[in-house]
Amino acid sequence: MDNDHLTTLNLGPTHPATHGVFQNILKMDGERIVDAVPTVGYIHRAFEKIAERRAFYQITTLTDRMNYCSAPLNNMGWHMTVEKLAGIELPKRVEYMRVVIMELSRIADHLICNSILGVDAGAFTGFLYIMQSREQIYEIFEEICGARLTTNMGRIGGFERDFNDIAMRKIDKFLADYPAVLTEFENLFNRNRIFMDRTIGTGGITAERALNYGFTGPNLRAAGVDYDVRVTSPYSSYQDFDFTIPIGINGDTYDRFMVRNKEMWESLSIIRQAMEKIKALPKGVFHAEVPDFYLPPKEDVYSQMEALIYHFKIVMGETEIPKGEVYHSIEGANGELGYYLVSDGGRTPYRLHFRRPCFIYYQAYPEMIKGQLISDAVVTMSSLNLIAGEMDA
């Protein structure tokens, strides 16, 4: 085709549909996309390099700011990586507490992804309904750790404090309220003729191409591949829970939407099971016995020399991790979120690499939107749940 007849269009970097600082230079034949060149790095913050100068516990503030829609998931994946290298084993109750927080984070992430997809397709009502439930989740986080979005939640070895009675009641209330909200949300979209026309056949990718790119998570399962890190490589006692892995068929925008909806139902089931297990165990256990990593209670710091020593050691970043290297991955809200850690036996990582699923999806994005309409490019990006903080890191 003669390029003289094509129009160059910038989608981003500050377009309201990009959900972050993305730029795509599109070649358009009318409203049809002929070619796309993505640009990355607008909010690259050199997290991996910064981590080489930080104590292990301080890196939580970096992982918090990758996929900020489900920050506790990122944090706990990092904590598990350090625990794996340091040989720290957690009590079952702590594992179950982590599962509750991780699945609440997954729901918060999925609901914002699917509701924003609705907004980009022209349906604003579902967003207004379901955001009330996101607020409930953030109130739970706030009760547990004092923060809502970038929570700094969790510690190497467990949690900074136990779930109090208010937090437990709020979790139970969310479990009681959310099914009706999710059902109403699905009724607005699942069989909506306009929404189906906008999403079915849009932004599709085959299972083979998805695997070649390195897709994982809901975007891979939407293409029909039954892969979930929680099942293939269980961590944090996920083997103790009964749940199914929803999969799609066509790998298009509609399938990605449906897979995330079904995953929220499964997450609710997992949280219910975890809460039953937590309530069956004695209260007060919320971290492993690892004084080198866990800050002692403040009243002990004022009265006991040993507690003061550990407090000083941790705050000054003098805790050392055994020499070695380890890779650990979790099923993040967007897919396999991996951490490759190399330690030279010092107080900071020698090298740290994050496997960021959004970065991988963005490489496939131009292929997925070629031949599509400009409006299809917007809903395709929404359905991939591309988060700039995770992609650029």
UniProtKB/Swiss-Prot annotation:
Gene name of this polypeptide: nuoD2
Keyword flag Acetylation: no
Keywords, alphabetical: Cell inner membrane, Cell membrane, Membrane, NAD, Quinone, Translocase, Transport
Localisation per UniProt entry: Cell inner membrane
Top-level class of the enzyme under EC nomenclature: translocase
The protein, known as: NADH-quinone oxidoreductase subunit D 2
Annotated PANTHER family: NADH DEHYDROGENASE [UBIQUINONE] IRON-SULFUR PROTEIN 2, MITOCHONDRIAL (PTHR11993:SF10), NADH-UBIQUINONE OXIDOREDUCTASE 49 KDA SUBUNIT (PTHR11993)
Function: NDH-1 shuttles electrons from NADH, via FMN and iron-sulfur (Fe-S) centers, to quinones in the respiratory chain. The immediate electron acceptor for the enzyme in this species is believed to be a menaquinone. Couples the redox reaction to proton translocation (for every two electrons transferred, four hydrogen ions are translocated across the cytoplasmic membrane), and thus conserves the redox energy in a proton gradient.
InterPro entries: NADH_Q_OxRdtase_suD (IPR001135), NADH_UbQ_OxRdtase_49kDa_CS (IPR014029), NDH1_su_D/H (IPR022885), NiFe-Hase_large (IPR029014)
Any one GO MF annotation of this record: NADH:ubiquinone reductase (non-electrogenic) activity
Family: Belongs to the complex I 49 kDa subunit family.
Gene Ontology annotations for the cellular component aspect, listed alphabetically: plasma membrane
Pfam families listed in its UniProt record: Complex1_49kDa (PF00346)
Subunit structure: NDH-1 is composed of 14 different subunits. Subunits NuoB, C, D, E, F, and G constitute the peripheral sector of the complex.
Chief place where the protein resides: membrane
Entry's EC annotation: 7.1.1.-
Organismal lineage: Bacteria, Pseudomonadati, Bacteroidota, Cytophagia, Cytophagales
Organism of origin: Cytophaga hutchinsonii (strain ATCC 33406 / DSM 1761 / CIP 103989 / NBRC 15051 / NCIMB 9469 / D465)
Top-level taxonomic group: Bacteria
UniProt membrane topology term: Peripheral membrane protein
Catalysed reactions, as listed in the record: a quinone + NADH + 5 H(+)(in) = a quinol + NAD(+) + 4 H(+)(out)
